[in-house]
Amino acid sequence: MKFNPFVTSDRSKNRKRHFNAPSHIRRKIMSSPLSKELRQKYNVRSMPIRKDDEVQVVRGHYKGQQIGKVVQVYRKKYVIYIERVQREKANGTTVHVGIHPSKVVITRLKLDKDRKKILERKAKSRQVGKEKGKYKEETIEKMQE
């Protein structure tokens, strides 16, 4: 059941918007979940992926325990290239294999002041969401008086 008349659920329209999305929206779509440790530390579930983040592939042919650094984020193709995820071409040269960001987990973030600000903002909004709709002890005591 659709509630918002301004949001479409038409598959072809959603595919069109996905593949014709501008770069600033592709950044948002190309987000990856954080590892359990980082999620605990920052109280944030996922972040848009970025060059120099360290990730671990958790789905597909290249999944495994080794952790690699993101070499390139290719927004046009919706893929990221990771340090050790390569294959050999027929002529013998090695090339990076593109992996979708949803199939990796971020194990270390490259932090700068802007990214720290984003983490704080996301954590704050998450905290507000947890407290929403709950009575505090003082309000309960006042109600009982």
UniProtKB/Swiss-Prot annotation:
This is Large ribosomal subunit protein uL24. Ufmylated by UFL1 in response to endoplasmic reticulum stress, promoting reticulophagy of endoplasmic reticulum sheets. Residues 1-21, 122-145 are annotated as: Disordered. NCBIfam families: rplX_A_E. One of its GO terms (cellular component) is nucleolus. Belongs to the universal ribosomal protein uL24 family. The gene is RPL26. It comes from Homo sapiens. InterPro entries: KOW (IPR005824), Rib_uL2_dom2 (IPR014722), Ribosomal_uL24_CS (IPR005825), Ribosomal_uL24_euk/arc (IPR005756), Ribosomal_uL24_KOW (IPR041988), Translation_prot_SH3-like_sf (IPR008991).
